[in-house]
Amino acid sequence: MITSAHIDDIRTQVRAWHAKGETVAFVPTMGNLHQGHITLVKEAAKKCDHVVVSIFVNPMQFGQNEDLDAYPRTLEADSQALTAAGAELLFTPTPTVIYPKGLAQQTYVEVPGISDVLCGASRPGHFRGVATVVCKLFNIVQPDVAFFGNKDYQQLLVIRTMVEDLSLPIEIIGVDTIREASGLAMSSRNGYLTAEEKAAAPALKKAIDAMAQGIKQGVSIEQVTAEAKASLIAAGFTPDYLEVCHATTLANAETTDQALVILAAAYLGKARLIDNLRFDR
């Protein structure tokens, strides 16, 4: 696997592949990789001739008092895992490479509406940071296809909308959430959990599953939400949000909506965990 922190190196290699008529998949990450990331790379390798991965802890998507400095950097282990999974090109830029003028002078990409609710309301500016860096990485790598995890459901919708609105010639593929045996969605932030907290963490998925089951049985959204919040609090969580939304617009679910998604974020100790469930009523 070739590794470079330089934009020109990445572009030169991808152009060479495209010149031969070969397809290129891209998996953007922030590193500290787990099996969920590796699954994205393996799926990308099935779809395309070559796989490019980026590791960049993006300062623009972290708010004040968030975990930018504490976010784990594990480049050596990540590189070994990516090589084994089939990645051929790894882009590891510094913030200066991505934002040479600094954040204050950077052009931004902002996706209105869906960026402002749920995680966007809890973390102002977060999705502007995500959209900007992903758009920039797309322009650097010029992939044919890009892969993202469905665990970050709102992020995936933001990126799909950005690609559509800006007419970017990239296919976006979402990959099912990879879970631990307990049902806990794999996340780099699971490393913040103590052993006791990790034992309690599967309650988040259980609460979401119970909500979906209740809604399918005709129980009101208000009732299933109240019961789920109570169960999370009893398990030691501090809920951030727990919402039932239209699956594609993220508007609050109406009684006539069939395609729904439950989106949840909750704090457990130092970790902010998110999860979701897409289902039909």
Swiss-Prot record:
Lineage summary: Bacteria, Pseudomonadati, Pseudomonadota, Gammaproteobacteria, Alteromonadales
Binding site for ATP: 30-37, 149-152, 178, 186-189
Reactions catalysed: (R)-pantoate + beta-alanine + ATP = (R)-pantothenate + AMP + diphosphate + H(+)
EC number annotated for this UniProt entry: 6.3.2.1
Residues at the catalytic site: H37 (proton donor)
Protein known as: Pantothenate synthetase
Organism: Shewanella sp. (strain ANA-3)
Listed GO CC annotations: cytosol
Main location (coarse class): cytoplasm
Transmembrane segments annotated in the record for this chain: none
InterPro entries the UniProt entry points to: Cyt_trans-like (IPR004821), Pantoate_ligase (IPR003721), Pantoate_ligase_C (IPR042176), Rossmann-like_a/b/a_fold (IPR014729)
This protein's record includes keyword Cytoplasm: yes
